[in-house]
């Protein structure tokens, strides 16, 4: 949560790369915090703390509010005449996503687009897409929140496959994705084609697996 607030500060100060670094750190923390909590049996240690509620509060800050603020503050990200409506659409549909009782399915998938808005704006920023293109992307992803596709939960792969080897390969791919994202941020404003290709390939693989497991369980 603290890093999310610092991200907002850096966005306000127009230090966009610094803000993206901080947002990347929040994604890494989110990827491992649940695993670490289960590893130490945090429910037993802190029985009166609702970890799931805290996780949702922090995730809404980091995955929704911070990216929305980025889109509003950085010039050229959205068409000025539609920016308020687009941000309203993103924030309201995301609130719906977070409030669903089955937003995370019993077999550990996300139902509907899982509000990866921080990752979305990273690619908008790196590819320098036009405001009109960004608007279309935001509208499509907001609609996908209501489409019951089961998106892979990267840190919980037990129901994705029974193969231990495939699970290990998925974790390796996730690590490669993280490293490639780091290289992309380090290289900016230059473009590291290899790292960018690896990053986009991972997103493609993630979407393929999600749609495949939805329609061919």
UniProtKB/Swiss-Prot annotation:
The keyword NADP appears for this protein: no
Similarity comment text for this entry: Belongs to the CDP-alcohol phosphatidyltransferase class-I family.
The protein's name: Phosphatidylcholine synthase
A Pfam family reported for this protein in Swiss-Prot or TrEMBL: CDP-OH_P_transf
Keyword Manganese: yes
Residue spans, topological domain Cytoplasmic: 38-50, 99-107, 150-164, 213-217
Any one GO molecular-function label of the UniProt entry: phosphatidylcholine synthase activity
Organism, as annotated: Legionella bozemanae (Fluoribacter bozemanae)
Function: Condenses choline with CDP-diglyceride to produce phosphatidylcholine and CMP.
GO process terms (BP): phospholipid biosynthetic process
Topology, Periplasmic side: 9-16, 72-77, 129, 186-191
GO cellular component: plasma membrane
Keyword terms: Cell inner membrane, Cell membrane, Lipid biosynthesis, Lipid metabolism, Manganese, Membrane, Phospholipid biosynthesis, Phospholipid metabolism, Transferase, Transmembrane, Transmembrane helix
Subcellular location: Cell inner membrane
Membrane topology of the entry: Multi-pass membrane protein
Reaction(s) catalysed (UniProt annotation): a CDP-1,2-diacyl-sn-glycerol + choline = a 1,2-diacyl-sn-glycero-3-phosphocholine + CMP + H(+)
